[in-house]
């Protein structure tokens, strides 16, 4: 019988050259076979049956194939990603997948999703099932308001004296996602019932199994509370399940299919941080599909390459609070495939429209280029009843919030006139960038009766900055291969009147200590 201790005696088995072998925790071993074929995948499936495993499940969509095998106390979950030619085989000792069950009670209430109120950002979602039980996804930080808001949501929506949580799904060990679970269980011990918990990250004694964890920033202030989490979880008496990609769990009247987990990314050399090991889930409920992305990186999880049009969903939880996740183009490809009608964005309005999210390339694509009916941010808390259709006014509401955020942050284009080269201070400007990302600014200098200097490039970091626009240590005047009017090729005339134009990719405020701007404007898409 194959198990995690002897699996390397059987894998690789068909002459493959590129095989990764990783223990992801004490009971799970993952093999990734690159540049492979569907024929090899079928051969592995036959091999597992020859070794005494029973095929329990098979499903496919597009070029994706999933097969689950049950052995004595061991499960094997084999995937073929046809579009990237990769076989992924997870071997799990003490697997509970085949004994999992959940009993759906009589219908008592309508199904709902609540995005729990957040002061800043985090991830806290409550799904109310038709039988009155709940699913919690993450929970947020261990801040008292996060903890209390979550309990209040459960208590007010519950049909029972004690809210019954059918399953608490923890997507990854980041403080703004799982720390609330610890504080919630401690503060409200005995006031709720937790039936099951689902997550896929290492036990406290399994960190030695990972490669270069310190280098990729896995262990630190976010993850050091994992041992405490396990202690708290044990006290709840909940059954614990480790979901793997391809598995489907029926929870009440909701169905969860897992599209990504640590086993998909941990073996790759490009693995950078714990966001990439997020559980990504495709939930079906009340005839609608919801895609929960947590903080997943579309680039490194390769979601679009693996699933393509299967990602289509009615409702999307925008990944990583809309902050971007290491790969704008890959995120945009995913969002286009998902093509949602409604989006959840787990960040407060301020964080989204004034500080960060709306100005990240991929999130901005959703706001300005996709025909999304509604974007629900987390600042006030939002509850939708399923099946859900956005109100007719919702699109205009988020468009107005975005336009207001742009105007409040400044302008994209600024002109200053009446300057003179005789005063070197006239070349020095102050820049207030209130958005938490660098502004890319192009600068043109127009001299009276002399050649202009064109397309000076400057990067303006977040916060207040001051520099001379002709200081070659602060600006790049020669970044273009061919620019006859570059900073190094045009001599600055003496005692000459000049004007300056700034064009920025994000709104900012530009000012001069001696001169008021002549004109400024913004373009809101």
Where are the regions a protein language model picked out?
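Compositionally biased P/S/T/G-rich terminal and signal peptide-adjacent segments
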Residues: 1-32
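Ser/Thr-rich, low-complexity intrinsically disordered terminal regions
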Residues: 55-78
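Core dinuclear metal-dependent hydrolase active-site scaffold
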Residues: 94-163, 234, 242-312, 383-399
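Binuclear metal-ion centers of metallo-dependent hydrolases, dominated by the metallo-beta-lactamase
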Residues: 196, 204, 208-257, 271-274, ...
